[in-house]
UniProtKB/Swiss-Prot annotation:
<feature type="region of interest" description="Necessary to inhibit protein synthesis">
    <location>
        <begin position="79"/>
        <end position="116"/>
    </location>
</feature>
<dbReference type="GO" id="GO:0001965">
    <property type="term" value="F:G-protein alpha-subunit binding"/>
</dbReference>
<dbReference type="GO" id="GO:0009898">
    <property type="term" value="C:cytoplasmic side of plasma membrane"/>
</dbReference>
<dbReference type="GO" id="GO:0061052">
    <property type="term" value="P:negative regulation of cell growth involved in cardiac muscle cell development"/>
</dbReference>
<dbReference type="GO" id="GO:1900924">
    <property type="term" value="P:negative regulation of glycine import across plasma membrane"/>
</dbReference>
<dbReference type="GO" id="GO:0060087">
    <property type="term" value="P:relaxation of vascular associated smooth muscle"/>
</dbReference>
<dbReference type="GO" id="GO:0048487">
    <property type="term" value="F:beta-tubulin binding"/>
</dbReference>
<dbReference type="GO" id="GO:0001975">
    <property type="term" value="P:response to amphetamine"/>
</dbReference>
<dbReference type="GO" id="GO:0017148">
    <property type="term" value="P:negative regulation of translation"/>
</dbReference>
<dbReference type="GO" id="GO:0060452">
    <property type="term" value="P:positive regulation of cardiac muscle contraction"/>
</dbReference>
<keyword id="KW-0343">GTPase activation</keyword>
<keyword id="KW-0539">Nucleus</keyword>
<dbReference type="GO" id="GO:0005730">
    <property type="term" value="C:nucleolus"/>
</dbReference>
<dbReference type="GO" id="GO:0005886">
    <property type="term" value="C:plasma membrane"/>
</dbReference>
<dbReference type="InterPro" id="IPR044926">
    <property type="entry name" value="RGS_subdomain_2"/>
</dbReference>
<dbReference type="GO" id="GO:0005634">
    <property type="term" value="C:nucleus"/>
</dbReference>
<protein>
    <recommendedName>
        <fullName>Regulator of G-protein signaling 2</fullName>
    </recommendedName>
</protein>
Length: 211
């Protein structure tokens, strides 16, 4: 059981490449794409933070407080290293983590986790059923557009559960994805330029007095 989980963790964020083994060109293309994404991470992070500061508010042509880029303080960013839950509980931390996962081509994990959080809050049986099917088609079924890396047994159990959807349909899968992120993506995030930049305190420079 433990070795199976280790293998799952090792494969977190690694896309299922059907052309695996086709050589350097595939790897070179992936590395080039990754470098491009990493190069503009600040722009993407700014977008996430700006939008997370004004949820549900439409953009207008006028400048407003909601449209101002708000960067979390270094002290707030440092709190995210205390626990994975601290990161997820912060809207800025969550936005930064999503931007980081996007640069690593594995944002489907956090998107699935967030979809499950929303799903568990759903009260209407009709909405519960429709959301369950959407989560299944988006993340669970074979070759889903955002397919997550979970075992066949869990997938089969979910396929049965969504026939009569309850708030616990995706509990097992959500816990496994959470564990994958906590043990793999989260440590890499804390070591990344993404995070280190946010933790830096601005340097105060003083101009020399005129003589």
């Amino acid at each position: 059981m433990q070795s199976a989980m280790f293998l799952a963790v090792q494969h977190d964020c690694v896309p299922m490449d059907k052309s695996a083994g086709n050589g350097p060109k595939v790897e070179e293309k992936r590395e080039k794409m990754k470098r491009t994404l990493l190069k503009d991470w600040k722009t993407r992070l700014s977008y996430f933070l700006q939008n997370s500061s004004a949820p549900g508010k439409p953009k207008t042509g006028k400048k407003s407080k909601q449209q101002t880029f708000i960067k979390p303080s270094p002290e707030e960013a440092q709190l995210w290293a205390e626990a994975f839950d601290e990161l997820l509980a912060s809207k800025y931390g969550l936005a930064a983590f999503r931007a980081f996962l996007k640069s690593e081509f594995c944002e489907e994990n956090i998107e699935f986790w967030l979809a499950c959080e929303d799903f568990k809050k759903t009260k209407s049986p009709q909405k519960l059923s429709s959301k369950a099917r959407k989560i299944y088609t988006d993340f669970i079924e074979k070759e889903a557009p955002k397919e997550i890396n979970i075992d066949f047994q869990t997938k089969s159990l979910i396929a049965q559960n969504i026939q009569e959807a309850t708030s616990g349909c995706f509990t097992t899968a959500q816990k496994r994805v959470y564990s994958l992120m906590e043990n793999n993506s989260y440590p890499r995030f804390l070591e990344s330029e993404f995070y280190q930049d946010l933790c830096k305190k601005p340097q105060i420079t003083t101009e020399p007095h005129a003589t």
